[in-house]
Design a protein with these regions (language model features):
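Active-site neighborhoods and metal-handling regions in enzymes and metal-associated proteins
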Residues: 1-506
């Protein structure tokens, strides 16, 4: 049987391109694309949620950010795949461009790249050749019979103030699910529905695809270039008008008071599930990562979860240095002194994703474990209790705290936080060194604060609370206690001790 690598290079030869971009996403540009739809996974065996591939006839370059440096090294065949490790502040597109010579042409799959991305590449001198179909694609039928209605502001109320002379096309799946108050809990790790939407003349319609609508409608069609794929953009042609942002994006990110109240209740149940796991770890011997992950899902279901919001990360010792470790091995048994990082979340009745990370220790911790844990805790406490409202600035503050308490060999190699909602990763808001984080976080926006420190020779610690902004102050949905055994209280200032005391309830 021909391998994926052979198949993709045969395609390149037939199409006359020496460079081909293979994506981790699908035509909806989903971040968490199921692996059975993930062409990058077929090529590289890398199972992370993000990270695209440049294929040449000599090499395959896998680009990954700091969350996946170690995981990529562990999963790929290095005789075939070269891992390009993006550092904080580096972007995938800029590093990709460096690998394309001036006279080179890059083949791309139009349905799997946003219009914003292709315009950036062209602006930077990259000649593109578009292909409509990816030869590695597998046909996956979507069963819409599982879609359910959830409570929320009506579609009519949401769109009544959209005053645009033409049709507005919504192509982001989170926005579509939000707009129609529809969810699909039939698969783990998502509550989104699949489809696109058009808003026209005070009404909204749900579409499977846009082809028939584009052909029959003669007016202007307004789009968000960051969420529409290049195929759909070109299909619209001269009818296209560009929006600076989808009118649904900001609306979705600023939660209603009812949504905030749902989240408060959902996180109470999430806290209880994690507390049950803490007790399970404390009171049982010879348990594995796999045992904990299985028990965790049962606890979520016991407290009413519809499904998990992402695949739980249960990582002990060195595995915890992989920011998005996802194996949960039966062979990784907790021993005395084992550190275990648990990053998890669930969907409840409203289909909004919860997200929390805690780190526990089996038995007695080492001094290094306590030092790293307490440093991460200091980063969280200072970021959480600041009066800052811009994600970029909050991220900088956490990094400043680490620079004042640096630990040799441990790195903080990801952003401080992300928005949450219908998906576990949403924008806005964003807390990172990225330019898109340089905007103010508005009241009722929901987001995570999750500093972490990692050393692949030892372990990693990440502490994550999902939060919201209220009256210009950050409030936490999460109230699960921190691991007292891992806190070196001598490292905390009196202010930090007081903050910790005020925060914890479980």
């Amino acid at each position: 049987m021909i391998s994926a690598v052979e198949k993709i290079r045969e395609f390149m030869k037939e199409q006359g391109v020496n460079f081909l971009l293979v994506n981790s996403t699908n035509k909806y540009l989903e971040e968490y694309t199921p692996l059975e739809e993930n062409s990058r996974y077929f090529l590289t065996d890398f199972s992370g949620s993000t990270g695209d591939v440049l294929v040449t006839f000599e090499d395959i370059y896998l680009f990954v950010d700091g969350r996946y440096h170690i995981q990529a090294d562990l999963e790929v065949n290095h005789d075939i795949v070269s891992v390009v490790k993006l550092q904080t502040g580096q972007t995938f597109l800029d590093e990709l461009i460096k690998k394309i010579p001036q006279d080179g042409t890059l083949g791309i799959f139009a349905k799997k790249n946003s219009q914003t991305r292709v315009e950036y590449l062209e602006k930077n001198g990259i000649k593109l050749k578009y292909f409509n179909n990816d030869p590695l694609d597998k046909t996956i039928d979507y069963d819409s019979s599982n879609i359910v209605k959830v409570d929320g502001v009506s579609v009519e109320e949401k769109i009544k103030n959209i005053d645009i002379d033409g049709a507005v096309l919504i192509t982001n799946l989170e926005e579509v699910a939000y707009l129609f108050n529809l969810r699909d809990f039939s698969k783990n790790y998502s509550s989104k529905i699949r489809g696109k939407a058009v808003i026209l003349a005070g009404r909204a319609r749900l579409l499977d695809d846009i082809d028939d609508f584009v052909e029959s409608y003669n007016g202007k069609i307004f789009v968000d270039k960051s969420t529409i794929n290049a195929y759909d953009y070109k299909l619209i042609g001269e009818k296209v008008e560009v929006l600076s942002d989808s009118p649904i994006k900001l609306m979705k990110s600023v939660k209603t008071d009812d949504e905030i109240n749902h989240y408060i209740e959902a996180f109470k149940r999430t806290d209880m599930a994690v507390k049950a796991i803490r007790d399970y770890i404390e009171n049982n011997d010879n348990i594995s990562e796999y045992d904990i992950a299985e028990r965790l899902e049962k606890e979520f279901k016991r407290f009413g979860a519809k499904s998990l919001s992402f695949k739980s990360i249960v990582a002990k010792d060195k595995n915890s240095a992989l920011a998005h470790y996802s194996k949960c091995s039966k062979d990784e048994i907790l021993k005395d002194g084992s550190l275990v990082l648990i990053d998890c979340g669930a969907y409840y009745e409203q289909g909004l994703a919860t997200d929390i990370t805690r780190v526990f220790v089996k038995g007695n911790p080492s001094e290094l474990q306590k030092r790293v844990y307490t440093t991460v805790l200091k980063m969280f406490l200072n970021a959480y209790n600041s009066d800052l409202k811009v994600g970029y600035d909050i991220d900088n503050l956490a990094r400043k705290i680490y620079s004042e308490n640096e630990i040799d060999g441990f790195v903080f190699n990801h952003g401080l936080g992300h928005g949450i909602g219908v998906s576990v990763h949403e924008y806005p808001p964003n807390l990172s060194k990225n330019e898109m984080a340089k905007v103010e976080i508005k009241d009722n926006m929901c987001f995570t604060i999750e500093p972490g420190l990692y050393n692949e020779d030892y372990f990693g610690v990440r502490l994550e609370n999902s939060c919201y902004m209220k009256d210009g102050k950050i409030k936490s949905f999460v109230h699960m206690n921190y691991e007292k055994k891992l806190i070196d209280f001598s490292m905390l200032t009196e202010q930090e001790k007081q903050w910790l005391k005020e925060f914890e309830v479980l």
